[in-house]
């Protein structure tokens, strides 16, 4: 019997309900003007009923081709993010020990109504050196402590302190409703219009004060309490790509008397964990108790804050403060030292901000917190904050260098040098204007994270060179040795292309060190991996990506190098141990600097394999983690590899560098391939995406780039540890360069499941 329309709808809803009960959600997309809720409310009600039955709560009204494209991208992005869970970690020491605490961020989408919950756990390291990561055994969980705090500032228990930024008067302001005005016009009449329309134009049941209070943590207007706003299981939003930063007392490698006095004065300041979340805030949690000390809402997320209150947000997830904060010690213009937090929003926005966190205990009111906000920088050429800033001392002064990220207005690569105290632009470099032949202006581009290095070999010298990659495969070189920025010299040292001529995007920061023949041969080795994973389309991209090691002489190159100028090393697959562990072996073609300009390795073992995390150079070993994402947007998966590469040749070392078979020892018999004992270059890490490298040994070489900030290592020892060599400072007659051996450590990274 043919079903009536009503029966057909009933049948569909029954099927959708069954699928949802089985854990399969269905996204409902309407097509054409006929499903526009303003024109056809009956159709809208029908599609909404189907969406509720399907488990997503709302349908997508694709009333035109553009909306259809955007809706499909939103759906795929939600599905992709929903397959992830654990994000990143921080530790309270440079190596794991019994007294160490590991801080692990997390995001969950499987709570009630899939409300994009975040968490940050503090885990102990037990007497065996093992991290106990059971949530029930956590020292604290930030989601729980934040729920227990009072959303009203100054109230008990632990009222929240939240600030934001007013770009009209250029300073921080408390994120509070101004009770002195009766107008629903925002935080205060003078600043309301600058904080976005979400706080200015609402109907009676969605007014600005209710929205602001909701964002602060008031749950009275949530649907579960009779209101119209989205339900939240916990106040803390999902923490996806923001790496938590642990900050205790100042510890930069700086021996000046003024800095030593500053470090001594603040040596016992309470440790704090800083992390961004997709609830619109950067959070500062007390590292001992887990209580939120303060939160900051950067200007780059203003325009999307209103989406957080929508009951349909759970199926239309957005990023907010998704960048990784970092803290560095800065000497201000009055010669006083300050610890400054620098942060951005990652995929959530286009601003870069700075907060003075010298004394966390002083930021105990919203007025004090607002005064500590130094600046919040935006620019027409600043894109989404995928580029991490780096502080460096140059001949012209101390500046914060950053690439402009992606999806900027003009979609070109720019390098910024900002005053770290004021946020003022010291200089802005238009790279394509400097080298027009390097850019295809018809294709979107942007500058990734930069490194700022001292290529002299003298640890006391100024930083003089910037290296950064872009989406078109250019490895840029900016000589900043001249104190006059208009005299900085821009060039491209490498144009990364695969064997078919396809550009190889560079989305992670390069790393640099002195070349293997220094000091007899002057110049730097620069290493970079290629590949991107920024959107859904990247999942299915199978272009070959590569790892490059390029020699950069003091004068640079008149024309960019290409792969034809470099020595190729070829990968092969193999296995080690029982049960077999997949490893990679590599050729050992001769590379001699400066006759050869470097080397490259094509990542050919796994289709779609790419590098999206910055490499690490330690004691002559270049350590690179790669990933092969699953092309299925609905599935977890992907395979990661770790490569331990001889930085001088792009080949493997003559002895094993890692415990490939997992037996707890590094031996020729157990960790090489075949009867001829071929030393592997890399090992498969398993399913999932791995973060950057964490090394646990204490051998600290003199390496580039120079380190600035509390996370910097101590100076190198006068006698190197056993089996570890390091580069000596040029001109030091008592120091002889040692043989460079790789670190013998199996644990090289923390598990990170990410897009």
Located regions from the model:
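Exposed acidic/Ser/Thr-rich ligand/metal-binding surfaces
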Residues: 1-25
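Short, flexible/disordered intra-domain loops and linkers
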Residues: 2-3, 36-41
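Residue-level preference for long, well-ordered alpha-helices that form the structural scaffold
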Residues: 4-8, 64, 314
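Beta-propeller fold recognition
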Residues: 17-25, 30-32, 42-49, 55, ...
